[in-house]
A protein has these predicted regions:
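Surface-exposed extracellular loop regions of Gram-negative outer-membrane beta-barrel proteins
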Residues: 1-24
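Beta-sheet repeat architectures centered on beta-propellers
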Residues: 26-41, 47-274
Length: 274
């Protein structure tokens, strides 16, 4: 990479003869460690977007583009680094948010499902599984440096993981033309933690009538392994669903909780345009 183009370096012949070929102009690399190789090609973060190369350069459509690049400390772009999480078909990048001098956020792309996710986490280096059984990452917290083992365990330090959540982007209910009455919804949740049938999380339904409005919380419901459905009486054009840790529960009940989210189904009924 240069500041304005991508080149390919190929071996031509002995003893040490290589050829430099222009691959694509108008692309760059935001930082020296912002490229990552994956089973489906090379991915990298540019100063204004994301790209992949598998014989040709292809821009990646990104549904969270504004979230990342409108909140990026460009003066700390050299700290951006890419990572591979092969177990979950993901590549991603850690970066410094606006106003932060250290890495504080990440963006992830699933190259099989073609979906994006965002989050907040402080990591400074990443080694995917292979040499070790699980991914390892370096991080800094409370004045100390740590090596974290990822994708294993839930709260190995004996402290519950509070403020944990997965939240969807807001989506149109139906086509968004008419109001829809949400009678109930059926979350697809699999609890994977160590505390068995006592595991609980909160399911939050948010809604709004018009795109320019803020999402408001319509309902928060506790969800366990025995919960089959959640009845509601929400009316809106757009909605979002959030799954979060039950931080109000006793400490013992919050330990060993883990969950995986599938596709949530909504029971809808048209409810007019006004």
């Amino acid at each position: 990479w240069t500041d304005a183009a991508l080149y390919s370096l190929q071996f031509i012949g002995p003893p040490n003869t290589f050829g430099l070929t222009l691959v694509n102009e108008g692309v760059s690399l935001i930082g020296p460690n912002a490229a990552i190789n994956s089973p489906t090609g090379v991915y990298w973060m540019d100063k204004k977007g994301f790209y992949t190369y598998n014989g040709s350069v292809v821009p990646l459509p990104c549904s969270v583009h504004s979230f990342v690049f409108d909140d990026l400390n460009s003066e700390q772009a050299f700290q951006v680094f890419g990572f591979l999480n092969k177990q979950f078909n993901e590549v991603g990048w850690f970066y410094c948010a606006a106003g932060s001098l250290t890495v504080s956020k990440y963006v992830v792309f699933n190259y099989v499902e073609q979906t994006w996710a965002i989050g907040e986490l402080s990591r400074t280096a990443w080694l995917d599984e292979g040499i070790v059984a699980f991914p390892r990452a370096a991080g800094y917290a409370d004045g100390n440096n740590y090596i974290y083992s990822h994708e294993t365990g839930h709260d190995d330090d004996g402290v519950p993981m509070d403020n944990v959540f997965i939240e969807s982007a807001d989506f149109d209910i139906g086509d968004g033309e008419e109001f829809q009455f949400i009678r109930r919804f059926i979350p697809d949740v699999k609890f994977t933690g160590d505390s068995g049938s006592t595991q609980t999380l909160n399911v939050v339904l948010k809604a709004r009538d018009f795109p320019g409005q803020s999402l408001t919380t319509d309902q928060t419901t506790a969800f366990t392994a025995s919960t089959t459905k959640i009845d509601t009486r929400a009316r809106a054009r757009q909605a979002a669903v959030r799954f979060e840790s039950d931080d109000d529960a006793d400490t013992g009940a919050r330990l060993g909780v883990g969950f995986v989210i599938g596709a949530t189904r909504l029971d809808l009924q048209p409810n007019g345009r006004r």
